[in-house]
Amino acid sequence: MSTRRSSRANKGQHSKREIDFYVDEEDLPSERKRSLSNSSQDNKRPHLDQDEDDGDYKENGEEKKDDDIEEEGEVRCTPCGTTSENYDEDSDQGGTMIECESCKTWQHAKCMGYRTSKTIPKHYRCNVCSGLNGDKLEKTNVDSSAISEKLKDKTRASVAKAFVNVFKRNIPESYKSPEGMDNEKLSSKWAIELEREIFIWCPKKDKKYTDKSRSLMVLIKKPNVMTRLIDGELSFTKLVNSPPEEIDSELKEYAERVRSESIRRSVLTVDANQGQRIRRTHKGEEIVEDASNQQEDVDISIMTRNIDHRRFEDEEPARGIIVNDNSKPAYNNYMEDEDDDEVGEEEAEEKQKQGSDKEGSTSDDKEGLPSSDIDDVPDLDDDELDFIIKGKKETKEETRKPSSIKLPPIFSSKIWSGRITFPDFASFGATGEFYTCSNYKNPTNPQEVKLHNRYVNISKEILSKDHYEVEGRLDRTRADAYLDKIITTRDLILVEIKCTENRSGYDKLYRYLLERNKVGVLSGRPAFVKDAYLLGIDGNDFNLPEYLKALHKMVGKVGLFALYIVKKDYVPTGPSILKKSTPNPTDYNSHSSNASSKEKTPLLDSILYKLGGNGTKKENIQIQTPQYNPPVAQNGLPTSLTTDQLSYLSGLVQQNPQVQQNPQALIQLLQQQKNTDYSPYH
């Protein structure tokens, strides 16, 4: 009697059944390939017991219905001690169960020594009915259970057991195993070593681990790979870490053939018989149309569209082009003129030349046309197009003559000199040079020069003092995280600090900031600067923050830098606005050199008011209307300004020429002059 399968087999899959994925079904006869989840319907068997879920089946041409709805038999698995009393179908971990044909009891297939479904015989009898005792079964399972003892993890144990089966079937019989080892022990040893290498390569035991195990099982089955393993030419480490193409030469050759075939199919080919270009795509072969290939069966109405109808107008020929010996185009209107007699002979010669030149070039296009008069008419369209193209080429050559573009003046990067002090730690003299900023490039065109000069002016406006102190310290990690986020909404400006005095103090501060992973907070930052830091930067560090890598020329740079976080797209008021220099006294002849600072405030307030700068008005200055707009002269200054006010403004504009085209900058300059103690009359 053939083996019965319980309905338990398809009610829950045990985790160890994943070993079945690694079994090669090609190694077994076709009649042995059957599923444990469904009952077999092989008509060749003389007897077949169906479960209550199997339905009807046909045997020897007669339809029978399974009326055997009896209860499932008793569970009696002596190796593991499972009985009907302690057996729970949902929580059982023993795997597939099989029924004895003699006593109708159920046992675990693996407890009976059947590791896979392929090893279960057609006619099964349990260990009691067959006369096998438990000692014999335990002895047969010693070698197969050794892997489970070494590999506690079920997944790893299943993969290792699958490798054991592969090695057993593929190790040649002619191979002499080492002393004290047979084929089975050698297979177990190699399987454990190979699984260990896979686990090292992918310790997560996920899909990547499973796919790698399957691919290696396929490789091991190849005779050339097994030969390399036996000879010691290929180690398990190399087998796991190398791509399959390097392990199997046949697979590499196949991949090369596939790659070359793919390239060949993507190349356009020409059919010599049909004169057509063919492109092979995933949709099949496509014919690529060529303008030079004319179809013989094209409608004559389509052909007439390409004919210039001016060729048929003999009475008043259209404007043509006469080509001289130097191939330079010249026009002929073909109109009656007083000079026709003088140029008539030249026209006749040129027409003969044009007719002979065009005869060969247009013979293909005019083939098959009904009229023979077309052959004598020159193709004017091509000549006109050639003339237009030549004319454009000449204009391009003329525009390309200026080889170099004159760049505007580039401001010097040296912007500051003074002293930096870290109280009770270090102090040194230094200079500051603008080094880089956000979106900065080396100035090679006028736009980049303008950007460079703008950031130089901003840097000068920032570093307006002679002495700066380190007011505090921040952790570099927190500062880097903050700067990585703020770089998208602010501009970063880096000024390189170079030592001019007390090099030891400079080096001491640099090493402190770099080794202690600190950032110094600088004093004296203007209102438009959000933060000012002093950084020790090593551009060769692999852990260089992303905001520094994004800046130009920072990779590989080493030194002390002042970093300023500025408002996005900030426009400086000019490099000389904050410069407190005494004006030339010749510009103020109408003023006394002994004027006091009290005289300046009313003057500036009046100027600011008249210019719309919201100056503070004194009691003796009366405002008639809030919307008063003073008349403006041609030079851009209000005509209501007094001589003293005009003279004062003239001196400021001479000192700061950049405000001449920027009225708002002039107002800001006046406001700054008002808020300082400096007086131009001292």
Curated annotation (Swiss-Prot):
Occurrences of domain TFIIS central (ranges): 155-275
SMART domains listed in its UniProt record: PHD, TFS2M
Composition-biased stretches (Polar residues): 579-596
Name of the gene this protein is made from: BYE1
Highest classification ranks of the organism: Eukaryota, Fungi, Dikarya, Ascomycota, Saccharomycotina
Region annotated Disordered, chain positions: 1-93, 309-381, 576-599
ZnF (PHD-type) intervals: 74-132
InterPro entries per record: SPOC_C (IPR012921), TFIIS_cen_dom (IPR003618), TFIIS_cen_dom_sf (IPR036575), Zinc_finger_PHD-type_CS (IPR019786), Znf_FYVE_PHD (IPR011011), Znf_PHD (IPR001965), Znf_PHD-finger (IPR019787), Znf_RING/FYVE/PHD (IPR013083)
Source species: Debaryomyces hansenii (strain ATCC 36239 / CBS 767 / BCRC 21394 / JCM 1990 / NBRC 0083 / IGC 2968)
Sequence similarity: Belongs to the BYE1 family.
Biased composition (Basic residues): 1-14
GO biological process per UniProt: regulation of mRNA 3'-end processing; transcription antitermination; transcription elongation by RNA polymerase I; transcription elongation by RNA polymerase II
Protein name: Transcription factor BYE1
Record SUPFAM superfamilies: Elongation factor TFIIS domain 2, FYVE/PHD zinc finger
Biased amino acid composition, Basic and acidic residues: 57-67, 350-368
Acidic residues bias locations: 335-349
GO cellular component terms, semicolon-separated: nucleus
Chief localization: nucleus
Function of the molecule: Negative regulator of transcription elongation.
Location(s) in or outside the cell: Nucleus
Keyword line: Metal-binding, Nucleus, Repressor, Transcription, Transcription regulation, Zinc, Zinc-finger
Source superkingdom: Eukaryota
GO molecular function terms listed in the Swiss-Prot or TrEMBL record: RNA polymerase II complex recruiting activity; RNA polymerase II transcription regulatory region sequence-specific DNA binding; zinc ion binding
